[in-house]
Amino acid sequence: MRLVVSSCLLVAAPFLSSLLRVSLATVVLNSISASFADLPAKFDGSVTKNGICGALYVADPLDGCSPLLHAAASNWTQHRTTKFALIIRGECSFEDKLLNAQNSGFQAVIVYDNIDNEDLIVMKVNPQDITVDAVFVSNVAGEILRKYARGRDGECCLNPPDRGSAWTVLAISFFSLLLIVTFLLIAFFAPRHWTQWRGRHTRTIRLDAKLVHTLPCFTFTDSAHHKAGETCAICLEDYRFGESLRLLPCQHAFHLNCIDSWLTKWGTSCPVCKHDIRTETMSSEVHKRESPRTDTSTSRFAFAQSSQSR
């Protein structure tokens, strides 16, 4: 069973990975026609439902751990365009970075990793005082955004995850995984059930008790006068004086009860030489049944001949 569970987890990994990729939001930098995967911050409204576009600015200071200096510019508040702040991870909490950017007049924040790591993380913050859109991108994506940021209106966009595609992939993944698990379970349990069913429905060939009783019997007196030997090959006990033995056509003898039980319950062959006694036993039985008919026919034929001679 552990093998089945391990196989299921191994098969499920690619589906879960693809689902995570489809669930990612994207950052689009229009100036170089590039898009980057990102993870929204963990609070409702972390990325506007219909997406948001605006001008991208590199934060000053870059770590965003103190109020950003852009607000000190004389023309900062006159620009009504949506403003994005690009901030590097580290030195302080995500919540401090977002609050500093928000208080400096930014409507969206892109935080990028400070180490070269492809795994994105979810920024966990207290949503009570935060209203800006916020996403997290990799170090590579952040360095590219930093290089090409121009502060132009509409140059950068945040697109929310495509929920429809995510649910489609989830449904396909679920049913595919269910199908694979079903196949593995069938492959695991079917042979056992087949073996049990076959064992229950396979009938052992046995002799009828009436045929067994037609086999000759004798009383054991001395092993020197009999070919039966001294020990029963079925129960492995020595013969005792006066015990009843049954003799098979192959000239092997056994205790009466032992061989009768063997032939009526377990098989039709001699336990010693495997000689099948069905043919000889049945043929002798048929011969006995046909003998009276033959004698009657012969007597009738003789009577008819004698009548004609008269």
From Swiss-Prot:
- Where the protein is mainly located, per its record? membrane
Domain annotation PA: ranges? 81-149
Enumerate composition-biased segments (Basic and acidic residues): 284-293
Residues bearing carbohydrate: N75
Give residue ranges on the Lumenal side: 26-168
Cellular component GO terms, alphabetically? endoplasmic reticulum; Golgi membrane; protein storage vacuole membrane
Q: Which residues lie on this side of the membrane: Cytoplasmic?
A: 190-310
* ZnF bounds (RING-type): 232-274
Function recorded in the entry: Involved in the trafficking of vacuolar proteins. Functions probably as a sorting receptor for protein trafficking to the protein storage vacuole (PSV) by binding the C-terminal vacuolar sorting determinant (VSD) of vacuolar-sorted proteins.
Tell me what this protein is called: Receptor homology region, transmembrane domain- and RING domain-containing protein 1
> Which gene codes for it?
RMR1
